[in-house]
């Protein structure tokens, strides 16, 4: 630690638990192991670039490509055109577009429908629910164009009813906390 930071109190996950945010591949595999709903996916490395291209060619668009690591909010691209998806794979895996963050790329099923974020504070066993938000990631009007690093958000989210929050608790939050405990991953 830097000496000036010694007196600053903060909260956050330990390194292993932080992978849930820092590695899309880790998070997807964790969700799969613990029955947490998530889009179908496959992960590829630079050495598997040709296999990744073959996988994209076997799928219907839109094509969702995600740099495995943190890329400043710009590591996810959704492309309608297969040619553009193949070029983006070359850029991400072949040319390391996002450095080590794109040393692996997750190719994911495209899901449609409303999207919102749920935030919790947890000690790894209990949690406190914070307000939900809907963010606006795309640079253009009507959520078009490339993702930005974060342009804005709206909270509260009208579509998030008590029933929806109950479903999120049962299907996402509780299995995540139980999965962390089952895998002996301390959260804080």
Label each residue range with its predicted role.
Residues 16-21, 71-72, 137-139:
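Short gly/pro/ser/thr-enriched loop/turn and capping motifs at secondary-structure boundaries
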Residues 50-52:
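Short acidic active-site motifs
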Residues 10-14, 35-42, 61-63, 97-104, ...:
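A short alpha-helix-loop-beta-strand transition element characteristic
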Residues 54-55, 88:
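CheY-like receiver
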Residues 60-82:
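Conserved anion/nucleotide-ligand pocket segment
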Residues 1-23, 36-46:
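A short, GP-enriched loop/loop-strand-helix hinge that lies immediately N-terminal to
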